[in-house]
């Protein structure tokens, strides 16, 4: 089970010691992936507004051919385009689902957002149908809020 307070504290420690967003993003993905057996693939995508895509920064899990996803396509691109998190209990029910691994049954996307900007998202896939709970989403949101603080600071 993800313990968001522990991870948020670790991310803040990295910030306090001068580490930049790259280190925080990698730590978040690694720790989220290790936190729960239901989390079969965890990755972070960042927004590239010039190309109108999200691009894969780093991940833990099976390699994916989808290093760039157009905004508005798939669960990740749609979450960014609509500006809201997404929890999909059964990916086979989603018309524009982009298959990375045919064994994936459910997916959760939590945006990394600052006040007026969406920086990216954390994407979590599971081979279990209906794998994700509201508590999972809330826990990951605590982590993405901390990541957003760092990304906003670096862009200011």
Residue positions per predicted region:
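Conserved beta-strand segments that form the floor/walls of ligand-binding pockets within enzyme
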Residues: 87, 111, 123
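Regulatory sensory and allosteric helical modules in signal-transduction proteins
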Residues: 47-100
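A short, aliphatic-rich beta-strand micro-motif
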Residues: 106-113
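Intrinsically disordered, low-complexity terminal regulatory regions
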Residues: 1-64, 151-156
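Juxtadomain coupling helices with adjacent low-complexity linkers
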Residues: 126-156
């Amino acid at each position: 089970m993800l313990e968001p307070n522990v991870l948020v504290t670790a991310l803040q420690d990295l910030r306090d010691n001068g580490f930049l967003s790259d280190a925080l993003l990698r730590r978040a993905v690694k720790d989220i992936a290790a936190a729960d057996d239901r989390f079969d693939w965890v990755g972070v995508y960042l927004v590239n507004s010039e190309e109108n895509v999200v691009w894969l920064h780093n991940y833990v899990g099976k390699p994916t051919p989808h290093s760039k996803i157009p905004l508005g396509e798939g669960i990740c691109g749609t979450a960014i385009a609509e500006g809201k998190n997404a929890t999909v209990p059964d990916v086979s029910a989603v018309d524009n689902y982009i298959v990375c691994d045919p064994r994936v049954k459910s997916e959760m996307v939590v945006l990394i957002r600052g006040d007026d900007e969406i920086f990216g998202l954390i994407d979590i896939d599971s081979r279990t149908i209906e794998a994700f709970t509201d508590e999972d989403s809330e826990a990951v949101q605590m982590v993405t809020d901390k990541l957003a603080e760092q990304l906003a600071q670096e862009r200011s």
